[in-house]
Amino acid sequence: MTKRALISVSDKSGIVDFAKELKNLGWDIISTGGTKVALDNAGVETIAIDDVTGFPEMMDGRVKTLHPNIHGGLLARRDADSHLQAAKDNNIELIDLVVVNLYPFKETILRPDITYDLAVENIDIGGPSMLRSAAKNHASVTVVVDPADYATVLGELADAGQTTFETRQRLAAKVFRHTAAYDALIAEYFTTQVGEAKPEKLTITYDLKQAMRYGENPQQDADFYQKALPIDYSIASAKQLNGKELSFNNIRDADAAIRIIRDFKDRPTVVVLKHMNPCGIGQADDIETAWDYAYEADPVSIFGGIVVLNREVDAATAKKMHPIFLEIIIAPSYSEEALAILTNKKKNLRILELPFDAQAASEVEAEYTGVVGGLLVQNQDVVAENPSDWQVVTDRQPTEQEATALEFAWKAIKYVKSNGIIITNDHMTLGLGAGQTNRVGSVKIAIEQAKDHLDGAVLASDAFFPFADNIEEIAAAGIKAIIQPGGSVRDQDSIDAANKHGLTMIFTGVRHFRH
């Protein structure tokens, strides 16, 4: 009995050659619509789908393969006599191979001219139905959704006249992943359209971007996936101009770096980061000077660090960066001369280019944090803060220079691991206390780092001070200005201590924990 294949594809790459090889192997081919036209034009003889179903394609192509003559031919178990008898009684011929890929829903909704009606019309119904029927019956039916599998299938058919069970099972698994991801995209689109903020089912889909050597540590397996609907301002979308493949830790650090610099839009700024904590932030009227400040902030920790700049890297800045061992440099662009300088004898230096004009769109992305057996979902810590809404809670008002420095410090503290303390002036970070289990410990570490640069310095805390001992430590170091959220039941103790020492202190009313 001649074996039959059903071919209906949106992505026609390689399909003509595949079909010709099938014909050479003695197969009959059933086809539909544009696929049939393409195969017929290439001289591949095909059977029209309506010759199999006895019904014409109708309703603008919405109904063409949803028929017992198709799905009976796919689902009939070859080892069940009752199935085979039912097929015979109803003149249903068996189908042994299905090659289907789906309407381009993802590509359609990414179009700038997308309309709701167009999106709906590009939801495939018949394709997923055939794929799922064939995949369910993979004991007997081979199903192909990816042109990359054409060669494997043809090779096995040529060698043995059939594919192996292992191949059919693998391809079936691929189909179910594919249709699940396809439906997840549709669900995400409709969820967005109706404005459902907290759906009872969370369906998200990601595509494999990079198979990694290992994860956070060598004993951990890891891979990097990119959102199926990619965003431009993302490490997953960055253009790599030089260097080795990004590691797991590189990606996490780089992601933290590009989040930090989003808050420094107004002036040229450089952020240096290690282990997801900023170790140096500098801003100035030009990017070279901003680099100088960021480097000066911590010339020790910068070794092996991640650097992100929010302006084009020029030759002068590149010359200063080149002698230092850095893991990654990220910027919106590089001058031709700067790129030549940075890549000279630096084949491993990872240089990334990222479109900073797409930052705003990245801020609305949800954050996902895995826990054992669960997933936490939250919006990003992105809030429009206006310094005019802040409250000076002490007797002394900040000077103009202190106010500028406090605003800079408040932007910087947002990305320091809690309990987080940062000391800055108006253009660079000076000391950092991160990740301590008590706040006064972070205060002491930050002061120790900044001890030679405390004249005119200010201090920011990511959360309230639970006790006045923090204020006593800060005052003893000579720091005169503090910014913090407030909100402690002992706020008045801290205010009284600040007034006692002549400090100025601002409450922002916004906490910035980062775990």
From Swiss-Prot:
Reactions listed under catalytic activity: (6R)-10-formyltetrahydrofolate + 5-amino-1-(5-phospho-beta-D-ribosyl)imidazole-4-carboxamide = 5-formamido-1-(5-phospho-D-ribosyl)imidazole-4-carboxamide + (6S)-5,6,7,8-tetrahydrofolate; IMP + H2O = 5-formamido-1-(5-phospho-D-ribosyl)imidazole-4-carboxamide
EC identifiers of the protein: 2.1.2.3, 3.5.4.10
Pfam families, per the entry: AICARFT_IMPCHas (PF01808), MGS (PF02142)
Pathway(s) this gene product operates in, as recorded in its UniProt entry: Purine metabolism; IMP biosynthesis via de novo pathway; 5-formamido-1-(5-phospho-D-ribosyl)imidazole-4-carboxamide from 5-amino-1-(5-phospho-D-ribosyl)imidazole-4-carboxamide (10-formyl THF route): step 1/1; Purine metabolism; IMP biosynthesis via de novo pathway; IMP from 5-formamido-1-(5-phospho-D-ribosyl)imidazole-4-carboxamide: step 1/1
Family under the similarity heading: Belongs to the PurH family.
Gene Ontology terms for molecular function: IMP cyclohydrolase activity; phosphoribosylaminoimidazolecarboxamide formyltransferase activity
Keyword Protein transport annotated: no
Record's protein name: Bifunctional purine biosynthesis protein PurH
CDD domains tied to this protein: IMPCH
Highest taxon of source: Bacteria
UniProt remark on domains: The IMP cyclohydrolase activity resides in the N-terminal region.
Keyword Metal-binding on entry: no
InterPro entries to which the protein is assigned, alphabetical: AICAR_Tfase_dup_dom_sf, Cytidine_deaminase-like, MGS-like_dom, MGS-like_dom_sf, PurH-like
Gene Ontology annotations of biological process type: 'de novo' IMP biosynthetic process
Cellular component, GO annotation: cytosol
Keywords noted in UniProt: Hydrolase, Multifunctional enzyme, Purine biosynthesis, Transferase
Chain ranges of the MGS-like domain: 1-145
Xref: HAMAP family: PurH
